[in-house]
Amino acid sequence: MRRDLDRLLNEGVNLHRRRFVTGLSLGGAALGLQPFGLLAGRGNEPGGTTLQGRVFNLTISQTAVNFTGSARVATTVNGSLPAPVLRWREGDQVTLNITNLLPETSSIHWHGIILPSAMDGVPGISTGFNGIRPGETFSYRFDVKQSGTYWYHSHSGFQEQTGLYGAIIVDPKEPEPYAYDRDYVVLLSDWTDEDPNDVYAKLKKLSHYYNNNERTHGDLMRDLEQKGLSTTWNERKMWGQMRMSQRDLSDVTGFTYTYLMNGKNPADGWIGLFKPKEKIRLRFINASAMTFFDLRIPGLKMTVIAADGQNVEPVTVDEIRLGVAETYDVLVEPADNAAYTIFAQDIARSGYARGTLTPHLSMTAHIPSLDKVANLEHRDMGMSMHHHMDHGMPDAGHSQPNMPATMDHSQHNMPGAMDHSQYTMTDRIKQMAPNSSDFSTGPVNHAATEYGPHVDMLSEDPQYRLDDPGVGLRNNGRRVLTYADLRSLHTTRGHPDPDREIELHLTGNMGRYMWSINGVKHADAEPLRWKLGERLRINFVNDTMMNHPMHLHGMWSDLESGDNYFLPRKHTVIVQPGSRISYRVSVDAEGGWAYHCHLLYHMLGMFRTVIVS
């Protein structure tokens, strides 16, 4: 990377190969010697430009940038970070000609877009697609069958971490259900000056390398004063036995990350203009590699109108947690001639991205302080609240216990897969209220492949916690959006009941930085084989203390939220630590599909290939 940077800075920037924002002069900024935020446009053009139409020509290349005072090399589209906003129209066929000027293979995945497998952009998994080799052009062509807010990013190596991501807006062919005066993309991301390969290597050697919020002697003294010696001792003993940290909230933090909003660092900040009493649509996109953001606009209520591009019944909140790869659309209506800060702090409270909604460029708003760092609780370990703190977790290396007869894996052809393919759900659903969801609160079973040194935690009592805002947001005095608030704007009454269900456990060993599904990493796992036309119920159990944003390519995930008549539709679902969650999938897309945790440094292990035939 250093050699690439020297080449770019010494040779200058070839604008034929690395196109900067239209109209930028060949000065210091063009050489990457100024903060790259200067290259980004204002308003709804976070990457400096919005491209609209049916045919798009995009070039992937290396571009010199500077977010921190040190020049680095980014992976960009048309010389822009974020990449240009792509604006499509529902019902159109779009063609995207992607030219790769990198010295390595690249790709682009259209996140949340329903399209043929061959156009999905995952090398080695998407049907017939092996990536875009250096110097080559690949043409994506597909019909746009949906509307809403989405995004695109590389699915090759760590290119997403180095800048290859951008927003997609799909305008509906029918009139929108909501009126607004302004329309802004607010794209959040995380940037590191380090080579992502070095970041990953450090995590493999010391998983908490970037955690600067470990508990201190001062925390111990406060606990002794507030909880007493016995409770404090038992609590500390429990965490010590598990060799886990109560503040293990995020693998990579502000210790190395600079958090960006529309390509602007916190010092510069993004700016969106408005006139008082205008209604503004904000399209929030979490395009980060590893960061969960907790977002609020002090002084303004946000009315959520869409989740992952799909319209939902309006719900008014103060704060939203954006998991990696999620999108939320909100409406805000500033009544006063005043400025407001868009404040997005990371889940570990190590930094923030920010922007300003303002009537005038000269007006600024107060920037809030970071919230206090939260501690993980019993519920985040999948433990019952009455669990005695003197009970240590099982030794990760203990022998496999006798499995109940119902968990006989001898007939399974997938390592560790709990595919109840012969289990019909008709009787269960008939016993439920006509429009209610079964939240799978029964006993949890662990596959034989979960036992061993590669898995350091098993949830004993994972709960379905749709109404839990999550660690750091509980009881904070603000109205926080939860999945329980999401209700589809359109009925799902006619959707069929599931034919069968599959249980997937999210597993890992934090100390060794090993991630897997059902205790099996992707390289050792057989594909999940689904039948075209069937309706599945996916049950996730999180056997780790991390949030995992699970993304299924090519098909919608209908979240079981309590009302089967209005199931919210998502492309990325957050599985909270020590919890369980379920959704329904109509298997309507033939071919090969990726299914994975969207935390970039988890993806090598917590990943499955899905084959639909």
Predicted regions, residues:
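Extracytoplasmic/periplasmic copper-protein system
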Residues: G47, Y165-S189, R354-H386, G605-S613
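Histidine- and aromatic-enriched segments that form or immediately flank copper-ligand environments
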Residues: R3-L5, L51-A179, D251, T256, ...
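Predominantly extracellular/luminal regions of secreted and cell-surface proteins
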Residues: T59-S61, L224-Q241, Y483-T507
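Signal peptide processing junction and immediate N-terminal pro/mature segment
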Residues: F36-N44
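Mobile cap/lid helix-loop segments that border enzyme active or cofactor-binding sites
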Residues: A71, L188-F274
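N-terminal export leaders
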Residues: H16-L33
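N-terminal secretory signal peptides
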Residues: M1-H16
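Histidine- and aromatic-rich segments of cupredoxin/plastocyanin-like copper-binding domains
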Residues: D120-I125, N130-I132, N234-D395, H409, ...
